[in-house]
Amino acid sequence: MQRALPGARQHLGAILASASVVVKALCAAVLFLYLLSFAVDTGCLAVTPGYLFPPNFWIWTLATHGLMEQHVWDVAISLTTVVVAGRLLEPLWGALELLIFFSVVNVSVGLLGAFAYLLTYMASFNLVYLFTVRIHGALGFLGGVLVALKQTMGDCVVLRVPQVRVSVMPMLLLALLLLLRLATLLQSPALASYGFGLLSSWVYLRFYQRHSRGRGDMADHFAFATFFPEILQPVVGLLANLVHSLLVKVKICQKTVKRYDVGAPSSITISLPGTDPQDAERRRQLALKALNERLKRVEDQSIWPSMDDDEEESGAKVDSPLPSDKAPTPPGKGAAPESSLITFEAAPPTL
C-alpha cells in the first residue's frame, strides 16, 4: 500500500499538470471547500429547497452545491469525475464548452431537485423536505459525464467479463444507486442528484449544445429510449415522442428537421444537422462504400453479356455486314462518360 501511494500521487500529479485551467480550477475548488468544512459550517453552500425559493433566495447555492463535499470518498469521486471529463470530453469540446456543460448540469440539478422536494412537501406537509434536505456533491455531474461518454464513445468496452459497454453505464449506475437507496445505505438527495443529472445532460446534449453543424445531436443511437433495455425501448420511445411533440407545440423544443441538399445530378450532399461529426463521417463512409460496391456489381453485369448473345451478334456480323450510318467519333471529342459514383460532401452550416 505504501509503495502504491507514491505512484498514484505521481500519476495524479502528471494528469493535473497536463490539464486545462478549467479542470485545475474545479479540482482546487472541491479541495478548498472540503478543507473549509473543517473550520466553518458549509451548509449554506448546498441547495436547501426551503431557502432557495422566496423569501430567502439562496441563489448562489446553484453554483456551489456541485463543488461541496463532506466526506473524503466523495472528494475522490468528484476529482475523478472532473479529471475524466477533462481527459475525454475537453479534447472534443474545448475548455469553455466543458465549463458550460458543468454549469448547465449543476444548475439544472439544483433547480429540479428543489422543485421535486417542494412537491414532496406539498404532498406530505413534512418540513424535513424543505429545511433539512441538502442537495450537494458531484453525482449530478457524474451522471452528465456518463451521458456525454455514451454520446461520444458508447461502443467502447469498460469490462470484458461480463461485457459492459459505456452506453449502458448511465442506467447501470442508476440501478446500483437505487438498490443502495432501498437498502438505506444512500440518502435520497444523492439519488435525486444523479437522476436529474442524467436527464438534464441528455436534454442539453440532444437539443441545445452548439457545434459546427448546428445544435444538438439527433443521432438514433442517442435517443432517449436507447438508455433502457431493448424490451422497453418501444414503449419508452412512444412516450418520449409524445412528450417531445408537446414541448414542440409549446415552443420549448424545436422540431427535428433533416435537410437534404442536392447540388447536382452527379453529386448529392446530405446534411443531417445535430449529428456528431465523427458519427456522421462514419455513416457517410459506410454508405458510400456500400453504394459503390452495388454500382460496381451492376456495371460488371452489363459489361459481360451472355454467351448466346455473343454468338448471335457474331453470326449477324458474318452473314450480313452492314455499313455504319454514323462515323466513328474521334477520340477526345465525344461526351465524357458520366460517373456512377456518388460522393458525400459537407453542406454549409445552417444559420
From Swiss-Prot:
GO biological process, one term: retrograde vesicle-mediated transport, Golgi to endoplasmic reticulum
Membrane topology qualifier: Multi-pass membrane protein
SUPFAM superfamilies: Rhomboid-like
One Pfam family it belongs to: DUF1751
PTM-bearing positions, type Phosphothreonine: T329
Membrane-traversing stretches: 20-40, 98-118, 127-147, 166-186
Record region (Mediates homooligomerization): 1-205
Self-association state and partner proteins as the record states: Homooligomer. Interacts with COPB1. May interact with LMAN1. Interacts with the COG complex; probably through COG3.
Protein name: Transmembrane protein 115
UniProt organism field: Homo sapiens
Lineage: Eukaryota, Metazoa, Chordata, Craniata, Vertebrata
